[in-house]
């Protein structure tokens, strides 16, 4: 490594942003192909390239931070600001879905029967699976906070147990959501109700899967002693993201499931 007189991390040229962007293009194109032509080839190719990109990009970041010592306090501060800005951009992303929902539901057009839910739509009972999902995510918020405090206090085994519980709850939430979609009495093509419901809850479900993946990486890193009580931004970022996913679900539950039904 060449000598440098500053604390910043000059990242080496990396192919992963490009392969990540191309895999995202393949996935979105593949999703369209699946919807319209019932072909999953492009979607599977996109998912495979996305998984490979994620694995290698995470591997490089772990090498730079844990083994090469590039993540100085100054670099960590920059990463913190970056994560905060990313979460703010995600808030604005979901604001669009809530806007679409309230725009349609607060002043239903005559085509919808002048009422909400629209005529012919039988909404899901908010006191059944959605309420269970809410309690599952709230419990996972408690367990990840337990994991964070255990890590800061140096209780390695407690941290692993709490993180495992959080991951298990995240997987359970995803399975419950999938079963709810499978049994729902309406589809994404059932007018504005179906499209706003499935797009908003579907993107939230995607974020839960991303957050769970993030936590699984942290779990394996903790098994390999990568985190210390004072140097663990990878886990901290995952925890922030998970709390964001929690809060979005509370808004979805109150707006779409409870008030919207």
Curated annotation (Swiss-Prot):
It is found in: Mitochondrion inner membrane. It holds the Pfam family COX3. The chain crosses the membrane at residues 16-34, 41-66, 73-105, 129-152, 156-183, 191-223, 233-256. InterPro entries: Cyt_c/ubiquinol_Oxase_su3, Cyt_c_oxase_su3_dom, Cyt_c_oxidase-like_su3, Cyt_c_oxidase_su3-like_sf, Cyt_c_oxidase_su3_a-hlx. Gene3D superfamilies: 1.10.287.70, Cytochrome c oxidase, subunit III, four-helix bundle. One of its GO terms (molecular function) is cytochrome-c oxidase activity. It catalyses: 4 Fe(II)-[cytochrome c] + O2 + 8 H(+)(in) = 4 Fe(III)-[cytochrome c] + 2 H2O + 4 H(+)(out). It is a multi-pass membrane protein. Residues 35-40, 106-128, 184-190, 257-261 are mitochondrial intermembrane. Its main location: mitochondrion. CDD domains: Cyt_c_Oxidase_III. Its EC number is 7.1.1.9. It comes from the Eukaryota. One of its GO terms (biological process) is mitochondrial electron transport, cytochrome c to oxygen. Component of the cytochrome c oxidase, the last enzyme in the mitochondrial electron transport chain which drives oxidative phosphorylation. The respiratory chain contains 3 multisubunit complexes succinate dehydrogenase (complex II, CII), ubiquinol-cytochrome c oxidoreductase (cytochrome b-c1 complex, complex III, CIII) and cytochrome c oxidase (complex IV, CIV), that cooperate to transfer electrons derived from NADH and succinate to molecular oxygen, creating an electrochemical gradient over the inner membrane that drives transmembrane transport and the ATP synthase. Component of the cytochrome c oxidase (complex IV, CIV), a multisubunit enzyme composed of 14 subunits. The complex is composed of a catalytic core of 3 subunits MT-CO1, MT-CO2 and MT-CO3, encoded in the mitochondrial DNA, and 11 supernumerary subunits COX4I, COX5A, COX5B, COX6A, COX6B, COX6C, COX7A, COX7B, COX7C, COX8 and NDUFA4, which are encoded in the nuclear genome. This is Cytochrome c oxidase subunit 3. It comes from Tragelaphus spekii. The gene is MT-CO3.
């Amino acid at each position: 490594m060449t000598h440098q007189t500053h604390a910043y991390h000059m990242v080496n040229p990396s192919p992963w942003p490009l392969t990540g962007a191309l895999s995202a293009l393949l996935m979105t194109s593949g999703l369209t192909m699946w919807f319209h032509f019932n072909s999953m080839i492009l979607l599977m190719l996109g998912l495979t390239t996305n998984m490979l990109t994620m694995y290698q990009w995470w591997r490089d970041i772990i090498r730079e931070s844990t083994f090469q010592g590039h993540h100085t306090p100054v670099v960590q501060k920059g990463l913190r600001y970056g994560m905060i800005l990313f979460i703010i951009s995600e808030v604005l992303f979901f604001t669009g879905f809530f806007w679409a929902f309230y725009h349609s539901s607060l002043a239903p057009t005559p085509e919808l029967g002048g009422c909400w839910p629209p005529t012919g739509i039988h909404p899901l009972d908010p006191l059944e699976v959605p309420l269970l999902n809410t309690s599952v995510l709230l419990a996972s918020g408690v367990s990840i906070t337990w994991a964070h405090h255990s890590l800061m206090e140096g209780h390695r085994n407690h941290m692993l147990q709490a993180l495992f519980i959080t991951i298990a709850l995240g997987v359970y939430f995803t399975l419950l959501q999938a079963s709810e979609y499978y049994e729902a009495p309406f589809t994404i093509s059932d007018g504005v109700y179906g499209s706003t419901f499935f797009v908003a809850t579907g993107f939230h479900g995607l974020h839960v899967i991303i957050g769970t993946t993030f936590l699984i990486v942290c779990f394996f890193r903790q098994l390999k002693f990568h985190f210390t009580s004072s140097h663990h931004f990878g886990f901290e970022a995952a925890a922030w993201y998970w709390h964001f996913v929690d809060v979005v679900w509370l808004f979805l539950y109150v707006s779409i499931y409870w008030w919207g039904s």
